[in-house]
């Protein structure tokens, strides 16, 4: 949260400096965007080898996002977005060390609303629906077990995300934005172990991210 406060402060300060006579706002019409993010998955519950109620802890990760959008005249923006996230498992039940990598590859259709106040700084909120592919790999295992049971695997579930942030129109064609996201899946993910009869089930995926992005608008004046 400290990182988000710093980014929002910088963006707001830049908006005050940019709020000159032109008072730039983003152009209407199509745009491209790309961003880089910090990702932190909170503790997630799962069932391992028939034992329910096990919690998993995760190290901080990162994310990438890119896509195309359209800015409508009444504050609505619609987007088609691809995003990818990477995180690393740390422990189960805060005590047992684990090793392995989790990847989230997602395609989302987003709808967002810009609160426009004749200012280059614009708050926005929105959300999206799509598909999440969750993949575990790099020998997802207990590293102290010899030989280990490997839980590598992947599957796809419907996904959702909520978004809130601020954007700064540097010019009508270029804007930068910072936003916070909560993202998850409908349903659970299951991973079969390399040893018959062993598996991880009922993994409920949800994560939190902070993204900084750049938008390029192809339209003229707003």
Residue ranges and their predicted role:
Residues 1-28, 219-222:
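Cleavable N-terminal export/targeting peptides
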Residues 14-21, 159-163, 211:
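A broad helix-preferring feature
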Residues 20, 29, 119-122, 157, ...:
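Hydrophobic alpha-helix-in-membranes signature
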Residues 25-29, 36-44, 67-143, 205-222:
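Gram-negative (and chloroplast) outer-membrane scaffold detector with strong preference
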Residues 33-67:
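N-terminal targeting signals for Sec/Tat export/insertion, comprising classic cleavable signal peptides
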Residues 87, 171-222:
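Predominantly the C-terminal beta-signal and adjacent terminal strand-loop region
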Residues 107-109, 125-131, 155-166, 180-182:
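Hydrophobic alpha-helical segments of small multi-pass membrane proteins
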């Amino acid at each position: 949260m400290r990182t988000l406060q710093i980014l929002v402060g910088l963006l707001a300060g830049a908006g005050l400096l940019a709020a000159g006579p032109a008072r730039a706002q983003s152009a209407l019409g199509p745009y491209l965007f790309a961003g880089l993010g910090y990702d932190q998955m909170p503790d997630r519950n799962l069932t391992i080898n028939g034992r329910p109620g096990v919690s998993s802890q995760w190290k901080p990760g990162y994310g990438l996002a890119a896509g195309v959008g359209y800015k409508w005249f009444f504050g609505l923006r619609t987007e088609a977005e691809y995003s990818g996230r990477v995180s690393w498992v740390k422990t189960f039940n805060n005590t047992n060390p684990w090793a392995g990598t989790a990847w989230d590859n997602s395609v989302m259709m987003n709808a967002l609303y810009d609160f426009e106040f004749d200012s280059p700084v614009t708050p926005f909120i929105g959300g999206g629906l799509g598909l999440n592919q969750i993949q575990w790999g790099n020998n997802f295992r207990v590293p102290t077990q010899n030989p280990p049971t490997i839980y590598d695997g992947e599957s796809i579930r419907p996904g959702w995300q909520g978004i809130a942030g601020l954007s700064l129109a540097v010019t009508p064609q270029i804007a930068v934005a910072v936003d916070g996201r909560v993202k998850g899946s409908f349903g659970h993910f299951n991973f079969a172990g390399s040893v018959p009869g062993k598996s991880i089930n009922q993994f409920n995926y949800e994560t939190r991210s902070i993204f900084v992005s750049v938008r390029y608008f192809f339209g003229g004046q707003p």
